[in-house]
């Protein structure tokens, strides 16, 4: 083999080696790009999910539109109260069966859960202040009564959504048994806390005297 053939063969081998290195670099770049694309897609989906959850957390919640109490002729104290609850504007559906009611008076803080069955009051608004609806309330449970429930979600599953209105019955005579309910000039605070979203706030001070059986408290 003369010198010209040797140099020619060497250049050919060098060219093939360069081509192999180039192909390897292209493959590595392709794999890296694929990993970056997949990672980017995952992060984008994760960010979207997190953003949606954050929006629901901020927008969702309950609102207390009023609280009414009934004073007993026996103890002359408020033996049960009714809080009217509706979802906040823009709120997602909320499962009231998982909501906890926190109520505090006279150094006693009670935590109540929903009774397992809601009362359907949409066919004809029931007397939510009557004693007959107290059978499902106790010192540890409150009663949900649906007043507006277009899709029947409250009556079926105790799920409150847009346009719904419910009454929450609380037996304060049993919750605060030591005082046989809530007397005059008493400060009461509480909240109905759902699984997610803002709670419905209950806070009132009873009047100096109870001149009527039914008392508007909040």
UniProtKB/Swiss-Prot annotation:
Glycosylation site residues: 38, 71, 77, 115, 136
Keywords tagged on the record: Archaeal flagellum, Glycoprotein
Subcellular location: Archaeal flagellum
Propeptide positions: 1-12
Modification after translation: N-linked glycans consist of the 779 Da trisaccharide beta-ManNAc(Thr)-(1-4)-beta-GlcNAc3NAcA-(1-3)-beta-GlcNAc.
GO CC terms, sorted: archaeal-type flagellum
A GO BP annotation: archaeal or bacterial-type flagellum-dependent cell motility
Predominant location category: other
GO molecular function: structural molecule activity
Pfam families the record matches: Arch_flagellin
Taxonomic superkingdom: Archaea
The family this protein is said to belong to: Belongs to the archaeal flagellin family.
Cited PANTHER family: FLAGELLIN B1
Function: Flagellin is the subunit protein which polymerizes to form the filaments of archaeal flagella.
NCBIfam families in alphabetical order: arch_flag_Nterm (TIGR02537), PRK08541.1 (NF006325)
Name of the protein described by the UniProt record: Flagellin B1
Source organism of the structure: Methanococcus voltae
């Amino acid at each position: 083999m003369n010198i010209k053939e040797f140099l020619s063969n060497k250049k050919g081998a060098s060219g093939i080696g360069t081509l192999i290195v180039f192909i390897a670099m292209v493959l590595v770049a392709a794999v890296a790009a694929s990993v970056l694309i997949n990672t980017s897609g995952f992060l984008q989906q994760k960010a979207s999910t997190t953003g949606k959850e954050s929006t629901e957390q901020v927008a969702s919640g309950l609102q207390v539109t009023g609280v009414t109490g009934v004073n007993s002729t026996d103890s002359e104290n408020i033996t049960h109260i009714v809080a009217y609850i509706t979802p906040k504007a823009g709120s997602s559906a909320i499962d009231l069966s998982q909501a906890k009611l926190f109520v505090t008076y006279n150094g006693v803080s009670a935590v109540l859960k929903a009774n397992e069955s809601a009362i359907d009051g949409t066919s004809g608004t029931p007397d939510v202040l009557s004693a007959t609806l107290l059978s499902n309330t106790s010192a540890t449970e409150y009663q949900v009564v649906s007043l507006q429930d277009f899709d029947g979600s409250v009556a079926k599953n105790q799920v409150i959504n847009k346009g719904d209105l419910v009454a929450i019955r609380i037996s304060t005579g049993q919750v605060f048994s030591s005082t046989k309910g809530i007397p005059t000039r008493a400060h009461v605070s509480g909240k109905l806390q759902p699984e997610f979203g803002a709670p419905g706030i209950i806070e009132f001070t009873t009047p100096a005297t109870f001149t009527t059986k039914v008392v508007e408290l909040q």
